[in-house]
Regions:
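Bacterial N-terminal signal peptides that target proteins for export
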Residues: 1-10
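Bacterial lipoprotein signal-peptidase II cleavage site
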Residues: 25-30
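C-terminal motif of bacterial Sec signal peptides marking the signal peptidase cleavage site
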Residues: 20-23
Length: 373
């Protein structure tokens, strides 16, 4: 099921005699002259926002994955193309997959800015929970939210423009925004958006992938003429994402990790992968660091899904050497066992449940929310 939510500010936007445009550089994209059509109301909403005199920062979530980084980059470029003074930032360092694809495609990642002052204007991409926001977000002024998750504690009703679609990647939504607003996607922006799309859908193979993702994939791959390379690029991205060489077990646990506040509980959820022949040892290592991770991140409960990979039985697909074959869902903290077992059944051993289902974190989070709330 796919849900699309558009919340639009209705404040005499269509009867304004004067249009206020904030000056800034528009070097990144060429804007097509606005015309009547589906994007007209969208443009009117943007024109009516309280942009203020300072830079509006566009942030993905903390511990950013590729989609978080690239959706913030892509949307900041779009806003600048329309004349709004926006700049992408990251609130914590990028992961190895983002580092790889940025080097491969030759784009710069946003600068690190770990906190913002009260009143700072923000646009959020790829998250909808304060626990995942840049520090200071509660006292900031959130102008927009572009996301593909269920509504978190940053409520849609308090934000002037919200676009939330239950599809595979936030970068797909950003692609749609460019088209609706009539802004041409240059090749560098196409690479940025494709990066997030490939990562969050794993080249359209994840169960969360929707038709909209396929449409964006086809257009971006075609524009960049990557039809013969995209499978290899995706494979190399996956290898970079799962490269834990030189990392401590605690660092591995939080390499793809998100915080949530649900039902009065502070929750942390990691997302990891391991080979089937290494699963027992890997699961035990992750269990061993959970007490410290819970303490360091000030959580009440801690979970992680660990996807188990097996050799691809399709010998003719060299770009997909491994495929997922179930997942372990591990837990720690008071009440965590009851939550995990309510979703996945009895524990295999203390701290460990298992399912043959292919589930993303995005699909597991609503199940936890339902139990706790």
């Amino acid at each position: 099921m796919r849900t699309r939510l558009f919340q639009w500010v209705i404040t005499a936007l269509f009867v304004c005699a004067t249009v206020w445009v904030v000056s800034c550089s528009t070097d990144d994209n060429a804007i097509i002259d606005p015309v009547d059509g589906p994007g007209a109301a969208y443009r009117a909403v943007l024109q009516g926002l309280d942009w203020g005199p300072d830079t509006t920062f566009v942030y993905g979530h903390k511990t950013p994955d590729v989609d978080a980084v690239c959706s913030s980059l892509g949307y900041a470029r779009l806003m600048r193309a329309l004349g709004y003074n926006c700049k992408a930032k990251i609130s914590s360092p990028i992961n190895r997959e983002t580092e790889f694809i940025a080097q491969r495609f030759g784009f710069d990642v946003p600068e690190l800015k770990t906190a913002v002052a009260a009143g700072t204007r923000l646009i959020l991409t790829d998250h909808t929970d304060y626990a995942q926001c840049v520090d200071g977000a509660r006292e900031a002024k959130i102008l927009q939210k572009i996301d593909h998750h269920v509504e978190g504690d940053i409520k849609d009703s308090g934000i002037p423009y919200v676009r939330r679609e239950m599809i595979g990647a936030t970068c797909t939504i950003i692609y749609e925004c460019y088209n609706e607003l009539g802004v041409a996607i240059d090749d560098e922006t196409a690479k940025i958006l494709l990066s997030g799309l490939l990562s969050d859908t794993r080249n359209l193979t994840k169960t969360t992938t929707q038709h909209e993702d396929s449409v964006a994939w086809t257009a971006l791959v075609g524009q960049l003429k990557l039809e013969n390379e995209v499978a290899e690029i995706n494979r190399l991205m996956a290898e970079a994402a799962n490269n834990y060489d030189g990392m401590s077990d605690s660092a591995i646990f939080v390499s793809d990790y998100k915080d949530y506040d649900m039902g009065g509980k502070a929750i942390g959820i990691g997302s990891l992968e391991c080979k089937a022949d290494e699963a027992d040892d890997f699961v035990s290592r992750m269990l061993a660091v959970m007490p410290a991770v819970l303490r360091d991140n000030k959580r009440d409960m801690l979970f992680a899904k660990i996807d188990v990979e097996v050799p691809n039985p399709d010998q003719g697909d060299p770009d997909t050497p491994y495929v997922d074959d179930g997942l372990y869902f591990i837990y720690y903290g008071e009440g965590a066992q009851a939550v995990a077992e309510a979703i996945f059944g009895p524990s295999l051993r203390p701290g460990v449940t298992y399912t043959k289902e292919h589930l993303s974190r995005k699909q597991i989070v609503p199940k936890i929310m339902e139990i706790l709330q």
